[in-house]
From Swiss-Prot:
UniProt-recorded name of the protein: Lipoprotein signal peptidase
Origin superkingdom: Bacteria
GO BP terms in the entry: proteolysis
Cell division keyword on record: no
Keyword list, A-Z: Aspartyl protease, Cell membrane, Hydrolase, Membrane, Protease, Transmembrane, Transmembrane helix
Function as written in the Swiss-Prot or TrEMBL entry: This protein specifically catalyzes the removal of signal peptides from prolipoproteins.
Organism whose genome encodes this protein: Brevibacillus brevis (strain 47 / JCM 6285 / NBRC 100599)
Family indicated by similarity: Belongs to the peptidase A8 family.
E.C. number: 3.4.23.36
TM region positions: 58-78, 85-105, 122-142
Location, primary (coarse class): membrane
Amino acid sequence: MWYYLIAAVIIALDQFTKYLIVKYMELGESIPLIADVFHLTSHRNMGAAFGILQNRRWFFIAITAVVVIGIVISLIRLGKKQPRASLALSFVLGGAVGNFIDRAMSGQVVDFLDFTLIHFPIFNVADMAITIGVGILLLDVFLDGKKNR
């Protein structure tokens, strides 16, 4: 049950931060928090990570729905038996649903976290959650592999 609460907190944080960006910033506006290093930049992405597959709204909605169903089924099966994998999936679930809401409502994802120093693509809380979840999942696979040797 905790895993769904974690996902819900991620979804709420993601949607709240995106709401603030849409409400208080103009599209394209950039506010330096650390000059030339990290900015809040109001951006919209109609594709996937790094802007690939632009204007494929229904494709992403369908894929995300399948992924979310798969994650929920996996959480039901794994639950407390594999807590690290379940934690990872809860992060991915929260991030996937956060971006799904954007795509379903407006056809685009609100991005705003901009590391200008390294010219990294602009991203959001949902993207961070997905990345953290995948990282935890990779760590889990690595640690389980070492344990089973």
